[in-house]
Amino acid sequence: MHADGNNPGIRAGMEMLGRPLDKGLSAFMEDLLQRGMLDDTLIIVTGDFGRTPKINSRGGRDHWTRLCTLAFFGGGIGRGQIIGQSDRTNSTPNGSSVSTGNLLATVMHTLFDVGQLRLDSSVPNQLLATIQRDAPIVAL
């Protein structure tokens, strides 16, 4: 969506990627709900970076590491929440921010008994260190 030779601008990109994502996630969520599996399945939608607050000269947005959007559903977490905010230019977090460590800790604490994971020798040490160092996103 940064509109270079290989990527469309925002309007075309949202049409090409946004609609199928919305349709697929909506159908998946509805299927999990109908099967009674939504509270046991945590879905997280994110990317590996955000996009610049301003549209560039080619009609797109470049990579931006200071801020990105996460969407959570299922897993027994609260619904209809907005957690955190950006500054008025949408360029940096305003107040506390959520790290990738917080995201990983949230997943692990939501889906597993973390005390039992600490006893499992097959769990990588780096993962255990992250779980011990970073707190889950409490507001969820």
Please tell me what each predicted stretch does:
Residues 1-140:
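Ligand-binding pockets and gating/stacking loops
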